């Protein structure tokens, strides 16, 4: 259909309405009036980021269960009109005379989407790219999303060597003939370690009810435990990821009743990158693959 000469953009999310008006004014000659061709933007109070775009000759409506999902729908619709968000300071804005788009819907393939580079920290640009990293500098009016607590390496936070090593060296990795304090991990077959970590994670969750993902992840170096108990399991499964997944699974089981919607995050990284032969993560466990050894110049 021909691009309407007069458009009315309305909705219950002011930021989405503002963005739609901004870009339509940049790519068309349309004017805005409350009596114009209706474009209705509606967001719910949930966290689902799927959205629906319904288009006919009488109106356009974009709907989502969440504000962030609605905003993604707005940017998706604009991209189908030819707009391109290339960088935080570079956009392609075509002149548009027609709307040749059929109704459609979209749902993210990944619940959490992040790019580890400086450009993705720009909140407005990251949302246009449909990223939902909690590291990006987004503002409240851009809508809420999945919240990631403590994001990365957490073993030292869960069991601090400075606090525990002198009195309980058995809590930490055994390698090179002794328990190690520096550049070490934790002994994940030690039941006391599991108990301490489980209680710490439960406290994180109780203290941060607006977060859904909590990291139980190895420190940023090698040093996996090679004590008899750990080594026996890891050798049988062919990787030091075996004791890690068993450990994380146990915490995931412990938090599930009180926090059925929360997830435990961990890494497949360095000595844990290779998957175990038979051990499978629980449904409420997220594994983040970190192939740091790979050459990123080749596909």
Protein language model features and the residues they cover:
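Residues at or immediately flanking beta-strands
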Residues: 36-38, 213, 263-265
